[in-house]
């Protein structure tokens, strides 16, 4: 009689090497998607237990004093208006089938990670919408505000007819932020369809509109199709001053994976993170509205 073969050895929990490979593929798959992370400085709260953090809207002190002996008192304080910010879990589940795992282990091939990578991209896309836009009509996000819908942000109506008026629009948005004491460097955030218009040549020159706009926004031009208006339209762009003093990404748990074998011998997995945008000085943001 043959010895009964041990069932489950080839379909056991993922090895350390397989887990490292999965994590590597997750990181590589989200890099092109995470535009917001290039804009937001990070504030790490240390663990995923925080469900809320406090945000603070601040006002400036009174102006400094000029005198001969420095004895006139001008002491006051920055006024801070506090408000709670929810820190949600962004997650997407996936499955690795046991037969695919056997094929990988016996065929000398890397583990199949298409489902894992797709799940990671879904999480990254949600993160980018959360940071760059926040909750908008048609996309519920626990009322969390990103750059495009931040209460107290500046707005400037577009002169329309892009790319002809793109330079004028961006310059006007910078002016709005400068009026509130923000002097750059500024970045421009826009959707790919509006960037395409900037690749046109200015009449009677060999210069692209994109080149002239780039001269105004020294912190760079960032392209993200996660940018929407509060109503869910795609007719806006943002000019922002990059600084942790203005806004930051709160991280309780950075992008991670969790894997567990089920009763059917398959691996159930989850890509997840615990993050939220915290907008401190919304006057560092100007939304250009009504692009045409």
Predicted segments, located by residue:
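Short, charged/polar micro-motifs that form catalytic or ligand-binding hotspots
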Residues: 12, 80, 105-113, 178-181, ...
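Alpha-helical scaffold segments that mediate packing/assembly in large oligomeric complexes
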Residues: 91-172
């Amino acid at each position: 009689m043959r010895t009964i073969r041990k069932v489950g050895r080839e379909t056991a929990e993922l090895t350390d090497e397989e887990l490292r490979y999965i994590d590597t593929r997750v990181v590589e798959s989200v890099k092109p998607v995470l535009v917001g992370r290039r804009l937001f400085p990070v504030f790490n709260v240390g663990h995923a237990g925080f469900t809320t953090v406090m945000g603070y809207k601040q006002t400036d002190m009174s102006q400094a004093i000029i005198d001969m002996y420095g004895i006139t008192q001008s002491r006051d304080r920055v006024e801070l208006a506090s408000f709670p910010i929810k820190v949600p879990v962004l997650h997407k589940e996936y499955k690795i089938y046991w037969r695919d795992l056997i094929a990988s282990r016996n065929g000398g091939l890397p583990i199949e990670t298409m489902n894992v990578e797709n799940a990671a991209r879904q999480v990254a896309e949600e993160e980018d919408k959360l940071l760059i836009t926040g909750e908008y009509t048609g996309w519920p996000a626990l009322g969390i505000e990103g750059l495009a819908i931040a209460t107290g942000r500046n707005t400037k109506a577009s002169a329309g007819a892009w790319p002809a008026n793109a330079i004028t629009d961006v310059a006007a948005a910078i002016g709005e932020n400068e009026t509130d004491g923000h002097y750059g460097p500024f970045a421009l955030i826009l959707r790919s369809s509006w960037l395409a218009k900037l690749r046109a040549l200015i009449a009677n020159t060999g210069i692209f509109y994109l080149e002239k706009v780039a001269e105004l926004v020294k912190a760079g031009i960032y392209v993200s199709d996660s940018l929407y208006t509060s109503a869910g339209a795609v007719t806006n762009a943002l000019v922002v001053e990059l600084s942790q003093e203005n806004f930051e990404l709160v991280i309780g748990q950075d992008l991670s994976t969790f894997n567990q074998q089920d009763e059917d011998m398959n691996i159930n997995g989850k890509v997840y993170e615990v993050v939220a945008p915290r907008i401190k000085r919304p006057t560092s943001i100007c939304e250009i509205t009504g692009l045409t």
